[in-house]
Each structure stands twice: as structure tokens, then as C-alpha cells.
Amino acid sequence: MLRNAAAGARKAVTELSQFPKPGEKLHGFTLVRSKHVPELELTALHLQHDKTGADYLHIARDDSNNVFSIGFKTNPPDDTGIPHILEHTTLCGSEKYPIRDPFFKMLPRTLSNFMNAFTASDHTFYPFATTNAQDFKNLMSVYLDSTLHPLLKKSDFTQEGWRIGPENPLAEDEASKKLVFKGVVYNEMKGQMSDAGYLYYIRFHDHIFPDINNSGGDPQKITDLTYEQLQKFHAEHYHPSNAKVFTYGDMPLIDHLKQVDTQLQAFEKIQGDKQVHEPVTLNGPKEVTLYGPLDPLVDQDRQYKTSVSWIMGDTTDVLESFSLALLSTLLMDGYGSPLYRGLIEAGMGADWSPNAGYDSSAKKGIFSIGLTGVQEGDVPKLKEKVQQILRDARNKGFDKTKIDGSLHQLELSLKHKTANFGFSMLNRLKPKWFNGVDPFDSLAWNDTINGFQAKMAEGNYLEGLIDKYLLNDNTLTFTMAPSTTYGEDLVKEEQERLSTRIQAAIKEAGSEEKARKHFEKQEQELLVEQNKTNTEDLGCLPTVHVKDIPRSKEAVVVRDENANGTKIQWHEAPTNGLTYFRAINTLENLPDELRELVPLFTDSIMRLGTKDLNMEQLEDLIKLKTGGVSVGYHCTPSPTDFHAASEGIIFTGMALDHNVPVMFDIIQKLVLGTDFDSPEAALRIRQLLQASADGVVNDIASTGHRFAMGSAESGLTRSAWLRQQVSGLSQVQLVTSLASRPETDKLEDVISKLKQIQNLALVGGNLRTAITCGSESVAANGASLQNFVGNLSRDPLNLKNPSPRQLPKDSKTFYPLPYQVYYGGLSLPTTSYTSAEGAPLQILSQLLTHKHLHHEIREKGGAYGGGAYSRALDGLFGFYSYRDPNPQNTLSIMRNAGQWAVDKKWSDRDLEEAKISVFQGVDAPKSVNQEGMGRFLSGITEEMKQKKREQFLDVTKDQVREAAQRYLVDGLAKGEGRVAFLGEKQAWVDGEWQIREMDVKGAE
């Protein structure tokens, strides 16, 4: 009865008959058309605003995680980053919310599980997601007013965009008074442009789409942007006539339309910037070579990045675009694909280039095939080799099994119920929508699949696409060569540009002293403006309330079974005919030398193949029969003792219910059957290592603060130390060291250890499993699991108990890396998950982030990001900064934050906001396969979670102060803090710091 009622409710949300008919008016909008898409369980409605012409797409679906986005077409007129700086400054105060930074001030006043803003190459959009109806209205009000009626103050432009000012205006020494370029976006883009992968993609984009300038901004050009240009660009582009609004979920469309119409009615219709830029015309071969940064952790001889690109057809042809994406998968995806085998396996490069594959986000599709880690002598050979592989693939044709495998992956992606389906939908539709592709065509999955299968039935369809687009020389070959002086050249250029600006200011002011006074005065005025953030009245901002948060949450129902010695956690839930499997094999006394190679082991078993099946055959089987299987390293502290840690190997898999036995068979084949003795095993493992090492400096930079935090934490707890060995900077050093071994090295010592891991991965240790599936599949899955475990000859492990390891004692560690900005972390030990003191620490981290650190580290210090965190399970409290130009200042702020929190007179509102922030994460929607996983992975029971929930709701101001005193102030005084920073080594990194060079062992 209840099930039928739920089905009825689901149907009601998407029932076409409840919506207006095309042509009908609705709160200032006219419904243009509607479409029910049963395969996605949704109904799409396209509306247009009568007065302004604003486009509106609503997707009705029985999903409580509702999404909103407003976006604008923002073709950048130059490389000054005007769309990017505007994206930042619109969020610094608006007519209805005239306070500093309402976007960040809203973060602790909302239960949203996602809030952000993004600048794409030719459009800018502002999305959020929440399950709370009042919250949705609140955020929509702030987003609409921020984008359509921003204050755009000059001080916001200088803070977020760029300015010249003293390096540290609060310090008295001469070095701190040195004039430098500053600004949040300026520093962000300096960080981005020192990432060789990002730089390659941006410069490639410059040449394939010469009419689309760099929307993010080139630091060399950002300093040309004026405040007046920013205002003009906003007036012309952030207008309803140039807007696309998107809503998704189960909340009533009528409520959304009323609210949006109220905001749009103030505008008259104008001619929006609807220009859709075409790529370059290629009537023959074109070659471009530019210089980029050298990666000091990779073989100096393999530093080139190069690619060959073709222009495809119009992406409004959704069927052809889908087919080209599938063709790209068949040609490039997986170790058995022809291009992987012919290029990377053949040793021409280490990995795919950042632009590789089919890109359908613009008006015309772009098909690129390229490599990183290429030797200079191989660069001119790439195009001919690619053409040869494409001709061979075209003549051979495509195996139906491989095509069916790709279509099967598509089927599973539709069935898999994710918590962020609406946001994924927005990301899939939005870029094409802004470039003229009808979103209704993009939504018509079944029509596209049926059309594809009809074309395939005619014969030679994919081969015909290769003929049509790829077997010609209308190509762009784009190469980035390494320059040993690239970083120095950037610094020199910046100094010259700064000097020119200062000279111009001196000329205008009449003297050097007057010019300096002008810059110092501007900086002081900005500081005064920034300091208002601590005292201004936020009463105008809407908020949800702690009283609206339920004191208890419906528990996830799981049950335990011990079937013939196999421990199973069952979670029965509606899964759309899918079964999700996890298993953990806990390993006691795992030696360090084996642990650090577990990531290489898990990569190797997805690469080498078995004695009976090569990797291509295994990949085909995985795609055809599962939604993916994986093997990885697992470690967790105990919820009752954060100093204790258990570790092991984790196995995951997903499949349609009837394919579960095959999924188990595949896992067994991969783990136990991988052939480490094959003649090419050493070569394949070397290629895996080289692919991991290639671009590692850029990979670190993309999450540099996480690497810094991980390094700091590794000196505090066993669990954090284990993580550092497997996924931190220690792992990076191991991989780069192994990758740099000479080609003559057969890696016998490494392979011997990988075989030891293979012998204990699945059959040694203590195995426990978890299955999430529909009730109707429990019996069959139980039998399949019994069969799987029964086939494993499980032996007791005989690993020697290692002597207890002392954690590193270095209180300050510095990693010299070639970045223009810094990444840092400071960490302290706290208490276990079940301790009552954990809740005040979590609240404290939110208070410090929103009330202090964001203001000090980002707004005043110029870093792209900074904050505090408390990880209850890990028993750690810490601070971080990201893309930070001012690390000394940041470290001082971190060290003094505890005392600041003790001295601060917290208000009831402060506490309320911090609790709301915590519950964004606590109550964020979960995908069905994540339910019950805290218990399985780490032993956190529903009772523990409920207790923690009540503790969060009941935290007092005194408890927060006590936690700050005990764990931060006293902890630092006792020397319990650990610090790590990454970046360029300068004079301030003195003898107190332990310097950890990241050099490759054995490299010249």
C-alpha cells in the first residue's frame, strides 16, 4: 500500500498533465514546450520570460535534492579575466544584501549541500543545491540579487581582481613594505598558470578557438583590466535577456517562477550576447609550439606534451556527437584500446595530454589525440603514427562486444541513483545549451540510443565517421616544450610589469614618495573596508534555524549475518536492479615495504592481465558485465580510540543483479590471477609508474593544501602516518624514485613484493563484506557470495609483528616545489569520535573558518582559500591555506587562532550559524550505495551518529572556548602542533624547518 502511494507521489511530480500546456502563461513566463523522459524518470519544461526573454529550463523529478542555477553568456573580450573577476565581485554585496561578501556570509546560514560559482570559457554560472524549501527560496533570493544587482564597489575590484600594495601592510620592516601585485584572482591564476597541464590546455584552447579569449585571466594581462571595464561588462552581460535559469527537483515550479519573475520584472529586454564562436578553420596542417614549465620530478628527457586535433561537426547533431564520444571511448579508453596500445604502450608517451578525447562542449566538436611525457625526437612522429593506428582501426572495424560494453555502462549510469543527479544533469546540459544545442535533444537518451543502433544496423557507421573526420591532414598539432627558465622568466616579466606600473604612478603623482603614499593609503582603506566584516549587521541576510533541524534522523537499517564464517552486512533498499558490493580484508602487521606498494599493486592488477585473459579481454568483460570493480588500500582509526588504526585491502563492485556472480569471478581473476611473471610485466609496471610520475608537480598543486595537511598530520597519529605512506608526499617520492630507474632495471625487487601482496590481498587476513541490494535479490546474492568466498583457499597470515614505529617528530616541515604561491597546513591531535569533546571542536572549526580565517587569510592575506577543520574520526584539528602568497602571515594567524577563539565574545547567532554549517555535511543526501557505509568502513554505528547529532545541537559557547583552550592553545604550548608548507624556498624558511627535498633518487 505504502509502496504504491510512493509510486503515485513520484508520478505526480513528473506527470505532464499537472503542468501548463505549451503557449500558456505562468507568472510572467510562457511555457514553450514540455517533454516527459521516462528513462530518466523526469519531465522537462522549457519556458521563456515574457518581458526580458530570459530562458528557463525546469526538470521535475522525484528527488528532494533540488538544484538552482542562473548563468550568463560571457564571451571574454580579451585575456584580462573579466568574466572571472566579475564572478568574484558580484558575490561581494548587492542592493538587497549590502554587506561584504554575502556569498560567504550565507555559507553558515544555509543547509545547502552545494554552493558555488564557476567561470567557463564562454559562460558563467551560479549553482546551489538544497533539500530544504525555505533554504531554496533564501539562496535563490541571494543569488538573483547578487548577479543582477551587485554593488560592484571599487574596493571589491581591487580586493578580488588586482592592485598594487605593500606585501604586508601591517608589518613595519622594510621588506614587508615592498610593493607587489595583489588580488585574489590574480594570485589564483598565478597558481593555475604554473600548472603545466592547465597551461597546455588553455594555450591549446587559445589556438583552436582563437575568438574565445582566456576567461580565467592571464596574470600578465589581468593587470590591464580597469574597474570601469568591469562595470560595463556586467551591464551588458549580466542581464535577464542574456540569462539561462535552471531548476531541478521535486519542489513546485510555480513557486520558483513567482520568485524569479519578481526579480526580472525590473528589466527591459535588450540584445543579449548570443554569439557562439566557431573554432579555427583548418584547411591543411597547422603546427604550433610554445614553451611551458619543466617538471623537476620527471625525467628531463621526457618533458614534451603534444597533440593532433581535428574539427568535428556541429554539436547540435546530438546523435553524431554521441557517436563520436563513443568512438573516442573505443579508440582511447582502456589498456586494450588501439591508440593506448599503439602510443603509450609502445613507449611514445607516458599518458594522455590534457585535451585528449572528444570535446562536445562548444558549437563544433574537437577530437584530439595527444600525449605527455614525450621525448623531443618523437614529437614529429606522433601525427603519422596516429594516422596509421586510425587507418588500421578503420579497416579492422569495431567489435560488437566493445560497443555493447560502452552501451551497458550507459545503462548502469542511468540506473545508479546518485545523490547529486540534478547537479550532474546541469553540468551535462549547460555548456551545450549556451552553445545552441537543444537541451531537450540532450535529454532524449532512448531516442539517441535507438538512432545510434539504427545507424549501426546499416553497417560501417563508426568507420564512416573516421573517414569523414579523421583520415585527413586538416589538423592542428599543438606542442609544449619544456623551458628550464620558464619560472624565472615569469618572475622577471612580473617585475618589469610592476616597475612600469609604479613608474606610471610616480609620473602621475609627481614623486616616488607620493606614489608610494597613494598605494599605502589604498591598502589601508581596503583594510578598513575588510575589517567592517567583523562588525557589520547581517540581519538583512535570510537564514534557516537550528530549531528546524530534527533532533533525530531515521536510522539506516542494516543487518549482520555470519554465513559459514563469512561476515556480511546487508542493506536492503530500492536500487533499480543493481547490487553494490564491498569487502575489506583486514591485514595485521603489514610491513612498510609492502604497504607503500599497495597502490602500485592495485594499478597493476588492472593492467597486466592473467595467464588466460589479456587486459583487453578483461576490460571488455568488466564493461559488459559490471558497472566497474576496484581494489584499493583501506585504513581507519577506531571510533573509540583515534590512536589505534586498522588497515587492509578494500574491494568494490557494482553490477546488475543477474551479473553478480560474474562480478565476483572478475574480482577473483584480477586479484589472484594477475600474471606478475609474464615477460612484459616489468615494462607495463614501468609504464604505470611513468604515467603516475608524469605531471606529478601539477597534481600536487591542484590539491596542495591536502598534501600539506597530510604531511603535518602524519606526525600525530598512526592512521594519518599510514595515509601519508600510501597517498601522501611519501608515496609521490616513492613513485617518482621508481619511475626514474634506468630502463635496464627489471624491477625484480618491486615485482617480488607485488607478488607477496597478491598472496595476502584476498586470501590472508580477516575478510568482511557488505552488500546493498533490493530485497528480491538477497537470496541469490547470498548464494553467489558464499560461492565466491568458498573458492578462496584462505590461509592464516604469518606476518611478523614489526617493532612499534615512532611517528616523525619534526614540528615544521618544508617541501621546496616550483610554485609561485604556497600551500600549508598546521595540525593538532584532539580526541576520539565517541568523546563528547568532539562536537565543540567541530563547531569551533566552523566558527574559526567563517568568522576569522576566511577574512584574515583570503580577504586580507590574498590567498585563494584558507580555513580550519576538525575530523572527529581521525582525532585531528587543523588549519590550511591554498594558493597563498603570504605564508609567514598565514602561519602566524593559524598559531594565534586558538587564543582568538578563547578571547572572542561569541554571540548566540555565531553559535547558531556554526551548527547550521556542521549539519550541511551531517544531513547531506547520500546515494543508496553510501548508506550504512560509515558503520562498515569505520565502525561508526547509528547509535554513535545519533549521540553525535545531539551533542552538535547542544554545544555551548563555554564548551567551544574550553575546546579552543585545551586543544589549540595548550596543545601548541606543549609542542603538539605539526606544520608543513609547500612552495618556493625563501629566506624565511630558516633552520627551524626540516627541509624535505622531493628530488628523484638517482636523477642527475
Curated annotation (Swiss-Prot):
Gene3D superfamilies: Metalloenzyme, LuxS/M16 peptidase-like. The keyword Manganese does not apply. InterPro entries: Metalloenz_LuxS/M16 (IPR011249), Pept_M16_N (IPR011765), Peptidase_M16_C (IPR007863), Peptidase_M16C_assoc (IPR013578), PreP_C (IPR055130). Its EC number is 3.4.24.-. Monomer and homodimer; homodimerization is induced by binding of the substrate. GO terms for cellular component: mitochondrial intermembrane space; mitochondrial matrix. The active site is at E87, E160. This is Presequence protease, mitochondrial. Its cofactor is Zn(2+). It is found in: Mitochondrion intermembrane space; Mitochondrion matrix. GO terms for molecular function: metalloendopeptidase activity; zinc ion binding. Degrades mitochondrial transit peptides after their cleavage in the intermembrane space or in the matrix, and presequence peptides; clearance of these peptides is required to keep the presequence processing machinery running. Preferentially cleaves the N-terminal side of paired basic amino acid residues. Also degrades other unstructured peptides. May function as an ATP-dependent peptidase as opposed to a metalloendopeptidase. PANTHER family: PRESEQUENCE PROTEASE (PTHR43016), PRESEQUENCE PROTEASE, MITOCHONDRIAL (PTHR43016:SF13). GO terms for biological process: protein processing. Keywords: Hydrolase, Metal-binding, Metalloprotease, Mitochondrion, Protease, Transit peptide, Zinc. Belongs to the peptidase M16 family. PreP subfamily. Zn(2+) binds at H84, H88, E188.
